[in-house]
């Protein structure tokens, strides 16, 4: 992505420009860190100037580069689109899972420009523990209260967007799954008054993508110049506008609730409690100041695209497996024989749990997780040194290790169900929400995805409705392929499926 920097530089006075250059040099000297001694797997080749070619090789062949690196060393460096990163073998996962000098927040600061206006949704996750506390406590504790509303929303959305047509018809899968996840998530985060607002749904979908593009745009600039560049760059201007639009949507809801609470207090009536994130954030912040719009965008950023990708991949993995789909229908019918969602429903959907976890094992969203930044020089248990300022990631290679998973490259929907049936020692490990070095779909350690319990519930609600209400198969002429870019893996964004309405045996 090329950015013309000359028009912006031309607006600076010569003296100011010289001052900025000198400040950049001083900043570099003051923050310079020791050089890593770890091998670099994709450095410059003979007659190459700069690292542009190395970045291209990374984007195209990251998986093979990391595999080759792990065969030679347990720790090595790799040139990525965001600079050089250190990749660690999964054997180090326990070393770093709670290491006090390895910081997720510091890694986010370096990657996402959190101190620049517009990136507020990332900033609130770094500078405050409100989001994490709300997800770990309020959201997880209220899963039973939010399951029925999500189910109601799924009924409304599927009827409108997937239709009741009993004739086979083709649809683009990812837009459909994105719509489901965005609306179900918004029902939980903002309640029923906002969750169907098309402007809010558009914002929640677009802000994540646009903020990532804005971050990439800024990385083309020296760090000292980025706050200035952000004032003029189109993507940065766009996310600032989106943040303001989010405020205009959310603030009236908050104001309306505040007035209703004041009226209830004045009349001596009990205040209405809401089972949504507006209520939970207010309860968790207490006397602390917070930005409601940024908090809501942060929740959406964390939830929507990751869950959408897993839902998309799971549906693609079910296509063409009619016997498996029938097994899932029978499990759903058995679990819902009394026709209600209760506290044991999600646990009882063990085959579905296994299917989702296996989809995530075969194709996670990234081939390395547990991003951390070393705030001091860190010495690992075997003496490996991670220099201060270095960003590290742990390879997910155990997810495809034949010593851990027999026939690891084969999708086995019953794999984790069979493990759970072996006994109590495997019960926890084999559940979708259980992270481990052998399955880092949700990360691992103290920063493992705190929203994984909600994601699992949301996925199961969506799949219950889709599986019971629709027949589906890959559309004729479509051959879904995993999209690979660097360490990222994405369910085919262009995949199309054929669907038709069926008569469900039970009602939710």
Swiss-Prot record:
One of its GO terms (biological process) is mycotoxin biosynthetic process. Its EC number is 1.-.-.-. Coiled coil: none annotated. SUPFAM superfamilies: Cytochrome P450 (SSF48264). Keywords: Glycoprotein, Heme, Iron, Membrane, Metal-binding, Monooxygenase, Oxidoreductase, Transmembrane, Transmembrane helix. It is a single-pass membrane protein. InterPro entries: Cyt_P450, Cyt_P450_CS, Cyt_P450_E_grp-IV, Cyt_P450_sf. Its cofactor is heme. It is found in: Membrane. One of its GO terms (cellular component) is membrane. The keyword Metal-binding applies. The chain crosses the membrane at residues 12-32. Heme binds at residue 449. It holds the Pfam family p450. Disruption phenotype: Drastically reduces the production of andrastin A. The keyword Transmembrane helix applies. Glycans are attached at residues 82, 145, 206. Belongs to the cytochrome P450 family. Cytochrome P450 monooxygenase; part of the gene cluster that mediates the biosynthesis of andrastins, meroterpenoid compounds that exhibit inhibitory activity against ras farnesyltransferase, suggesting that they could be promising leads for antitumor agents. The first step of the pathway is the synthesis of 3,5-dimethylorsellinic acid (DMOA) by the polyketide synthase adrD via condensation of one acetyl-CoA starter unit with 3 malonyl-CoA units and 2 methylations. DMAO is then converted to farnesyl-DMAO by the prenyltransferase adrG. This is Cytochrome P450 monooxygenase adrA. It comes from Penicillium roqueforti. The gene is adrA.
């Amino acid at each position: 992505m090329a950015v013309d920097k000359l028009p912006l530089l031309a607006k600076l006075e010569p003296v100011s420009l010289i001052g900025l250059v000198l400040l950049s040099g001083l900043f570099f000297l003051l923050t310079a860190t020791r050089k890593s001694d770890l091998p670099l797997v994709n450095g410059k080749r003979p007659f190459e100037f700069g690292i542009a070619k190395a970045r291209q090789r990374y984007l195209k062949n990251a998986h093979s580069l990391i595999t080759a690196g792990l065969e030679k060393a347990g720790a090595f460096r790799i040139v990525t689109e965001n600079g050089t990163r250190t990749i660690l073998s999964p054997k180090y996962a326990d070393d770093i899972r709670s290491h006090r000098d390895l910081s997720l927040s510091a890694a986010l600061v370096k990657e996402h420009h959190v101190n620049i206006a517009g990136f507020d949704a990332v900033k609130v996750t770094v500078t405050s523990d409100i989001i994490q506390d709300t997800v770990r406590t309020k959201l997880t504790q209220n899963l039973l209260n939010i399951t029925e509303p999500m189910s109601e929303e799924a009924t409304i959305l599927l009827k409108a967007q997937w239709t009741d047509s009993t004739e086979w018809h083709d649809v683009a899968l990812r837009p459909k799954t994105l719509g489901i996840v965005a609306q179900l998530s918004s029902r939980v985060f903002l309640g029923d008054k906002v969750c169907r607002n098309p402007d809010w749904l558009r914002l929640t979908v677009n802000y994540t993508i646009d903020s990532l593009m804005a971050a990439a745009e800024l990385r083309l600039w020296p760090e000292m110049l980025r706050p200035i560049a952000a004032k003029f760059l189109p993507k940065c201007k766009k996310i600032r506008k989106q943040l303001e639009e989010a405020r205009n949507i959310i603030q009236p809801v908050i104001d309306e609730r505040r007035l209703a609470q004041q009226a209830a207090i004045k009349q001596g009536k009990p205040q209405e409690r809401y089972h949504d994130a507006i209520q939970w954030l207010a309860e968790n912040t207490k006397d602390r100041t917070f930005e409601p719009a940024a908090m809501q965008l942060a929740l959406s950023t964390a939830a929507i695209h990751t869950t959408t990708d897993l839902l998309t991949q799971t549906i693609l993995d079910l296509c063409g497996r009619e016997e498996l789909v029938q097994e899932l229908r029978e499990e759903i019918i058995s679990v819902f024989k009394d026709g209600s969602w209760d506290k044991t429903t999600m646990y009882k959907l063990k085959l579905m749990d296994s299917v989702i976890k296996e989809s995530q094992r075969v194709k996670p969203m990234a081939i390395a997780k547990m991003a951390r930044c070393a705030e001091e020089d860190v010495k690992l248990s075997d003496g490996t040194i991670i220099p201060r300022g270095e960003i590290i990631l742990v390879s997910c290679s155990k997810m495809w290790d034949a010593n851990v998973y027999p026939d690891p490259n084969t999708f086995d929907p019953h794999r984790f169900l069979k493990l759970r049936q072996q006994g109590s020692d495997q019960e926890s490990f084999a559940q979708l929400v259980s992270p481990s070095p052998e399955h880092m779909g949700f990360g691992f350690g103290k920063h493992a995805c705190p929203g994984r319990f909600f994601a699992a519930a949301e996925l199961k609600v969506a799949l219950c409705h889709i599986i019971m209400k629709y027949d589906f198969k890959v559309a004729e002429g479509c051959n879904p392929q995993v999209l690979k870019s660097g360490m990222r893996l994405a369910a085919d964004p262009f995949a199309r499926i054929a669907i038709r309405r069926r008569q469900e045996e039970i009602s939710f």
